[in-house]
A protein has these predicted regions:
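Short amphipathic alpha-helix with an adjacent loop that forms part of the alpha/beta core around
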Residues: 111-119
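Catalytic cysteine-centered active loop of the rhodanese-like fold, especially the PTP/DSP P-loop
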Residues: 63, 101, 118-143
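Short beta-strands and strand-loop turn motifs
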Residues: 126, 151-155
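Active-site beta-loop-alpha junctions enriched in small/polar residues
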Residues: 60, 106, 155-157
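Active-site catalytic loop in hydrolytic enzyme cores
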Residues: 101-111
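Short gly/pro/ser/thr-enriched loop/turn and capping motifs at secondary-structure boundaries
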Residues: 132, 157-160
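Active-site acidic carboxylates
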Residues: 8-100, 121, 147, 151, ...
Length: 182
């Protein structure tokens, strides 16, 4: 917190945990890299809660009609169907008392409404897949909040492959998103 005149202004960090769901970790689209980041994610989330950060979980969310969607035609692997075990956030990192956002697309399109009225001074992004949903949300957030520092912790992210993970980190750095842990 900082003093401005006689008023105290609270500075807040938002930790956004992107799509760390069973289907992306051990399920239909899981990878060994996604499994490997779970201890780092748990530590990061625990530290954020202890620091009083705003913790927000996103969930990739599809319906039974997934195969008929544009994404389903390009990636014909049913995953994260709402209500299934694969759709759930991985138990060891989930915090049911934190905000959970369901999003039907790679990027959440209502960040301005969710974060705009808060005294957020820093945003940190972690999760999966670095090269799809993490980068999509990082770029949306950067466009909406160009004066807020946005960081991606590479040690708490996993991509579809190590190569596309690294490419996404490089692309985000090019857009003035700070990458740590790489």
């Amino acid at each position: 917190a900082a003093k401005t005149g006689s008023a105290e202004v609270a500075f807040m960090k938002a930790l956004i945990v992107i799509d760390v769901q069973n289907d992306f970790v051990t399920g239909a689209l899981g990878t060994k890299q996604a499994v490997a980041i779970l201890p780092n994610l748990k530590s990061k989330i625990d530290a954020g809660i202890a620091a009083g950060d705003e913790i927000i979980f996103t969930r990739d969310t599809h319906g039974a009609d997934y195969a008929d969607t544009n994404e389903g035609r390009h990636l014909p692997v049913p995953h994260c169907i709402k209500g299934t075990e694969g759709w759930q956030v991985v138990r060891e990192i989930d915090r049911p008392d934190c905000v959970h956002i369901d999003k039907p697309t790679f990027g959440y399109t209502d960040w301005a409404a969710l974060l705009g009225g808060r005294e957020i001074t820093e945003i940190e992004i972690v999760g999966v897949c670095t090269d799809i949903c993490v980068i999509s949300n990082a770029l949306i957030l950067k466009a909406l909040f160009p004066e807020i520092d946005i960081t991606v912790d590479a040690d708490c992210c996993a991509g579809v492959s190590p190569e596309t993970h690294r490419a996404a980190l490089t692309a985000m750095q090019s857009c003035q998103i700070r990458v740590v842990g790489a």
